Amino acid sequence: MGGCTSKPSSSVKPNPYAPKDAVLQNDDSTPAHPGKSPVRSSPAVKASPFFPFYTPSPARHRRNKSRDGGGGESKSVTSTPLRQLARAFHPPSPARHIRDVLRRRKEKKEAALPAARQQKEEEEREEVGLDKRFGFSKELQSRIELGEEIGRGHFGYTCSAKFKKGELKDQEVAVKVIPKSKMTSAISIEDVRREVKILRALSGHQNLVQFYDAFEDNANVYIVMELCGGGELLDRILARGGKYSEDDAKAVLIQILNVVAFCHLQGVVHRDLKPENFLYTSKEENSMLKVIDFGLSDFVRPDERLNDIVGSAYYVAPEVLHRSYTTEADVWSIGVIAYILLCGSRPFWARTESGIFRAVLKADPSFDEPPWPSLSFEAKDFVKRLLYKDPRKRMTASQALMHPWIAGYKKIDIPFDILIFKQIKAYLRSSSLRKAALMALSKTLTTDELLYLKAQFAHLAPNKNGLITLDSIRLALATNATEAMKESRIPDFLALLNGLQYKGMDFEEFCAASISVHQHESLDCWEQSIRHAYELFEMNGNRVIVIEELASELGVGSSIPVHTILNDWIRHTDGKLSFLGFVKLLHGVSTRQSLAKTR
């Protein structure tokens, strides 16, 4: 397992604010650079500038002595005269195969030139038609005094700067400069536009880099942000030799989880969380941590999934590689950061980028090597629950702040969890039988889980009768809303919760509605909990039900052979739901999945 111990050196410090090079390498022969820029799938994939292909060195030509082509006279009169040839056979040239290879390469290159030229012409024509006007202010020179360059990335660079006038006069800031010449496609233009929109829309969190303004001229776009002079989190990890104590790691992770939970509530997924994208405000040991670089971020609704592959290889989640993901992908990245903080090594490592991707998809992180045996059980459990490959089993950022390892560190205000919306929506659309099953399962919740749900219930401002309604949810959203929440259309999602418009929900039902069966299944106590839940269901919720009625409750169409699918869901002795049917009902196993298994 490779240690997180080095960073690419450069005469100019890598720019923490600048957008990263988005290149996806699929060739196993391409080494994975430790400081490599984020990956982004693209129809046109360029070779990495860090790893050019090497051409063979020219062979040294050996001078050979010429041979006599004539036969000459024989020393014996009885010998047969040698046959005379027009020219002698020369020894095989040691450089001939090299010349052949170079000739074939030249032919291929010449054949490819027309296609390459055509592609370049098409790109130039496309670029000519691109609208690179963003509508930003053009008064940069009158308001901002640019200083020296402090960092450089593939698509731009960052300068220190000062405000010349106004309330912020003499305030030091960082200005990210993105040349418009680098914006060669509509996608790259939209990326810049979206980054500014997200920075402008997100506000009000102490661990979020402050955005001041955006400017443009004919040559560049300028994004003015808070100047963080304390360096990257990665620098501090390296300065410590790659290992943090558990308490020091908690102090870092609490800040990361808090700001990520805030972004997720606003409907923003960062998609490139890594130590390089967290900066300290000052050199002080206990200075505040700020998340930066929203160049790959996007808006996402609670019921929406993204499909483009973006991020950095070591931190990318499995579902991103499968092209179907949402906010849980950020939580995976936090799990990788937590693993590095506690042991100094990456959980997934390989010599090539494609090898890293295979490890992310197939391998399990090791908790057997030092220092893991000496760390607390709670610390290991915390990291494991962030690195579940199934995103449905992964903790959310808000839930992670309630994990026993974190919760015991100091008093933390738990942010509202966007997962609650998804769970309530699914609950309201469930059959009465599934609601009864969820109610039985909620009776087995642990104390820690109940504390988390109590905090979430309080965020929804229950009325004097102890009930939450659609209006109270709207009020809770308005209390926590930023402009980003409007962009991600989260308020529109409330239309799917109309079941609460005329009927409130008390805390007991809220627990049943909010419980995540997949998360609960990942706990060590699952087998015991599900057995106990079934016993409670037998006493209070189970009833005699025929297959046709069960099919109706599940919304199974008449064209589906329900007896084949649901036969094992019902006990033949008394016609009630079997334990297997109870478990499947809780998981919400679709009839399509069940039908596929019977074939």
Swiss-Prot record:
The active site is at D272 (proton acceptor). Residues 430-450 are annotated as: Calmodulin binding (CaMBD). This is CDPK-related kinase 2. Residues 448-484, 485-520, 521-560, 563-592 form the EF-hand domain. It is an enzyme of class 2 (transferase). The modification Phosphoserine is found at S37, S312, S578. The gene is CRK2. It comes from Arabidopsis thaliana (Mouse-ear cress). There are 3 contiguous domains conserved in the CDPK subfamily: a kinase domain, an autoinhibitory (junction) domain and a calmodulin-like domain. The autoinhibitory domain (411-441) inactivates kinase activity under calcium-free conditions. Residues 411-441 are annotated as: Autoinhibitory domain.
